[in-house]
From Swiss-Prot:
It catalyses: ATP-dependent breakage, passage and rejoining of double-stranded DNA. Its cofactor is Mg(2+); Mn(2+); Ca(2+). A type II topoisomerase that negatively supercoils closed circular double-stranded (ds) DNA in an ATP-dependent manner to modulate DNA topology and maintain chromosomes in an underwound state. Negative supercoiling favors strand separation, and DNA replication, transcription, recombination and repair, all of which involve strand separation. Also able to catalyze the interconversion of other topological isomers of dsDNA rings, including catenanes and knotted rings. Type II topoisomerases break and join 2 DNA strands simultaneously in an ATP-dependent manner. PROSITE patterns: TOPOISOMERASE_II, TOPRIM. It is found in: Cytoplasm. It holds the Pfam family GyrB_hook. Mg(2+) 1 binds at E425, D499. GO terms for molecular function: ATP binding; DNA binding; DNA topoisomerase type II (double strand cut, ATP-hydrolyzing) activity; metal ion binding. The gene is gyrB. Mg(2+) 2 binds at D499, D501. It comes from the Bacteria. This is DNA gyrase subunit B. It comes from Vibrio parahaemolyticus serotype O3:K6 (strain RIMD 2210633).
Length: 805
């Protein structure tokens, strides 16, 4: 360490170096996927700002096959003129200078989103490559950046009569530990944005899978959002309460809400289109006005007198779905990620607007007002009944925390952070778990049968369920709005351990429904896990081994197959064995698995045949004859191997503007024709690169007289696939394989060793990435309405390997 601390010790990070040095400050976590997806949102927010200013109608977000993302819009296009101070094009300034852009000039954008206020320059800094295309002033301008540095100045490459911007970026693997984009995370945010910006069309296209795209365009704005949130639920009143008010101080307040016959409160808050997960002053204002207005209306109309029970704000919000969206010129948030709004002036703005408009709505719609008041009174009565039920059970002593439920085998550890609670299905598995556990920090709670489906049950009915009451007591954090306190939780590791059969899956789903609906904070804090007991036990001779899943089973079979095996590529060649053969098998299996994954988008036979076809590079596509020869060879191989009803033909498409010829494979099956074009993105993708690498390894590997040997047995082979298949078949001789259905099939030692020992066990942590999606999924799968559930099963049945209905 340097002894001198002087002016030379002070480092000034110039330009975008600061972003690359500390990416988390600018974009969020670079390991868990949040930062990666924020890259897309930063670019989309620029297009949304154009839409807010009235210049943009269509936004298209595309996840390309090479895992790059492009965002294009039909806005005004980023200015291309020279910047007076920076002496480069304005577009280059926006791409390379932090905090540059139109948001800081109040005349360009009145309110703007942008999650971290740093914009597209951060995306540029954290990408291996960015291609910027601008349609503006009758010209198409383009510029390419690598790691934030422009390769050349902005150049004109053609003429156009359109306007708009397209930014395509390849995230840097040096910054992000995982560069795989999740469609659902992008879809959730883009859906929100389309609701919040009525009339803007947002398309999301995933080129990695066939026909996977969504078109989000909602004319109804946040009214349509509420309608969407209440899909598969039964509204109490058909009419959606809605107002949009712009105040003189520049704050605009928009609220939409509707009650349904459920028991959950669903309120989503936004400031300048940015979601606040933890609410803030706008939520406080909304809640205060809702409670005050409804209470005074019920007093005035005599509902409170008839009810004979006092109503609270919680009763008013039972079954309420609401979206609160405020536009604030200079919002203040509690942190950089803007999860909570702290601008004090917003509370009074929302409260006064909401109070005034809700009063008008109740007076002008007496029949709807009556239905809402009846629902609130019902909620108050149920709350009162639940309170009495709790008091009754307390008096009996069953729910008194001094006496924990008799079934619970508690642990000695008193620190919740170190304690684990295993929720086990059935008494037999419970017995094994109690004997096999580590008493110091592992508690066991066996549950008998299936617990109540809390999605369909009211609170008082839920409390009267014996299994639910046992679970609540064991957890120790109480339940219900008055008593629930997640900080009092007795175990910070709650592990659901059920059998690997249909009943086990059902019980696990019922438990997850309970946690999601009644104790969502436990999931949000990462306390809920699902145990992953082994699926198989294999026995060969006297050796026994546990195998966790199908993939591990395949790996085990391969390792067994390679034992004492050797491949001879011709009659005279030395044996290929040991590590060299293992490496080849691993590469082959990885290629086959990759081809299976790619066959979601392309025909399975086509993708698998690429493993046996020479590589076609993007550069070769400038030579039409080379593309013709490659495509012809591929199609001939496909037709030669086809045993079904499919016929293959091809075309070579000329893309004159790019100077490229690209292959198109045509598949005709039972008179139906499908065309599959192989794009430049496909040829440049990592996936195709891996298949082509494998094809180069296999090409010419086996010659005349090649054979495979295992022990003393041999077989002449003509392909590597044939050799591997024979090896696996040979290795399975004398092997018994037992599939575990229930945890009770294991003795205590086996259960400890495979599922409960912290050194060797595997667990899945339960998380919620898309709150709206999770809510809808629980409503569809666990709610009262049968039709949406049937539709869900029909749509997804083919995606499952083992379906039991």
């Amino acid at each position: 360490m340097s002894e001198n601390y002087d002016s030379s010790s002070i480092k000034v990070l110039k330009g975008l170096d600061a972003v690359r040095k500390r990416p988390g400050m600018y974009i969020g976590d670079t390991d868990d996927g949040t930062g990666l997806h924020h890259m897309v949102f930063e670019v989309v927010d620029n297009s949304i700002d154009e839409a807010l200013a009235g210049h943009c109608k269509d936004i298209v977000v595309t996840i390309h096959e090479d895992n790059s993302v492009s965002v294009s819009d039909d806005g005004r296009g980023i200015p291309t003129e020279m910047h007076p101070e920076e002496k480069v094009s304005a577009a280059e300034v926006i791409m390379t200078v932090l905090h540059a852009g139109g948001k800081f000039d109040d005349n360009s954008y009145k309110v703007s989103g942008g999650l971290h206020g740093v914009g597209v320059s951060v995306v540029n800094a954290l990408s291996e490559k960015v291609v910027l295309t601008i349609h503006r002033g009758g010209h198409i301008h383009t510029q390419t950046y690598r790691h934030g540095e422009p390769e050349a100045p902005l150049a004109v490459v053609g003429d156009t009569d359109k306007t708009g911007t397209q930014i395509r970026f390849w995230p840097s693997a040096e910054t992000f530990s995982n560069t795989e984009f999740h469609y659902d995370i992008l879809a959730k945010r883009l859906r929100e944005l389309s609701f919040l910006n009525s009339g803007v069309s947002i398309k999301l296209i995933d080129e990695r899978e066939a026909d996977k795209q969504d078109h989000f365009m909602y004319e109804g704005g946040i009214q349509a959002f509420v309608q969407h949130l209440n899909t598969n639920k039964t509204p109490i009143i058909e009419k959606i309460f809605h107002f949009d008010l712009e105040r003189e101080d520049g704050i605009s307040v928009e609220v939409a809400m509707q009650w349904n016959d459920g028991f959950q409160e669903n309120i989503f808050c936004f400031t300048n289109n940015i979601p606040q997960r933890d609410g803030g002053t706008h939520l406080a204002g909304f809640r205060a006005a809702l409670t005050r207005t409804l209470n005074s209306f019920m007093d005035k109309e005599g509902f409170s007198k008839k009810a004979k029970t006092a109503t609270s704000g919680d009763d008013a919000r039972e079954g309420l779905t609401a979206v609160v969206s405020v536009k604030v010129p200079d919002p203040k948030f509690s942190s950089q990620t803007k999860d909570k709004l702290v601008s004090s002036e917003v509370k009074s703005a929302v409260e006064s607007a909401m109070g005034e408009k809700l009063s008008e709505f109740l007076v002008e719609n007496p029949s709807e007002a009556k239905m809402v008041c009846s629902k609130i009174i019902d909620a108050a009565r149920a709350r009162e009944a639940a309170r009495k039920a709790r008091e009754m059970t307390r008096r009996k002593g069953a729910l008194d925390l001094a006496g924990l439920p008799g079934k619970l085998a508690d642990c000695q550890e008193k620190d919740p952070a170190l304690s684990e609670l295993y929720i086990v299905e059935g008494d037999s598995a419970g017995g094994s778990a109690k004997q096999g556990r580590n008493r110091k920090n592992q508690a066991i709670l066996p549950l008998k049968g299936k617990i109540l489906n809390v999605e369909k049950a009211r609170f008082d009915k839920m409390l009267s369920s014996q299994e639910v009451a046992t679970l609540i007591t064991a957890l120790g954090c109480g339940i219900g709005r008055d008593e629930y306190n997640p900080d009092k939780l007795r175990y910070h590791n709650i592990i659901i351990m059920t059998d690997a059969d249909v009943d086990g899956s059902h019980i696990r789903t019922l438990l997850l429904t309970f946690f999601y609906r009644q104790m969502p904070e436990l999931i949000e804090r990462g306390y809920v896990y699902i145990a992953q007991p082994p699926l198989y036990k294999v026995k060969k001779g006297k050796q026994e081994q546990y195998i966790k899943d199908e993939e591990a089973m395949n790996q085990y079979q391969v390792s067994l197959a390679l034992d004492n095996a050797s491949l001879h590529v011709n009659a005279e060649a030395p044996a290929l064995a040991g590590e060299a053969l293992e490496k080849l098998v691993q590469q082959y299996n990885a290629g086959i698995k990759l081809a299976d994954r790619m066959s979601r988008r392309y025909p399975r036979a086509l993708v698998h045949e690429l493993i046996y076809t020479s590589r076609l590079t993007a550069e070769q596509c400038h030579d039409a004859a080379a593309v013709e020869a490659w495509t012809k060879q591929l199609v001939e191989q496909l037709n030669a191997k086809e045993v079904g009803a499919s016929q293959y033909s091809y075309e070579v498409e000329l893309h004159a503007e790019l100077g490229l010829s690209l292959p198109k494979i045509i598949v005709r099956t039972h008179g139906v024709t499908h065309e599959h074009a192989l794009s430049v993105d496909f040829l440049n993708s990592k996936e195709y690169g891996k298949l082509a690498d494998l094809s180069e390894v296999l090409d010419g590997l086996l010659e005349e007289g090649a054979y495979i040997k295992r022990g003393e047995r041999t077989l002449p082979v003509s392909s590597f696939a044939e050799a591997l298949e024979w090896l696996v078949k040979e290795s399975m001789r004398g092997l018994s394989r037992q599939r575990y259905k229930g945890l009770g099939e294991m003795n205590p030692d086996q259960l400890w060793e495979t599922t409960m020992d912290p050194e060797t066990r595997r667990m899945m942590q339960v998380t919620i990435e898309d709150a709206v999606g999770a809510d809808q999924l629980f409503t569809t799968l666990m709610g009262d309405q049968v039709e949406p559930r049937r539709h869900f099963i029909e749509e997804n049945a083919l995606k499952v390997a083992n379906l039991d209905v």
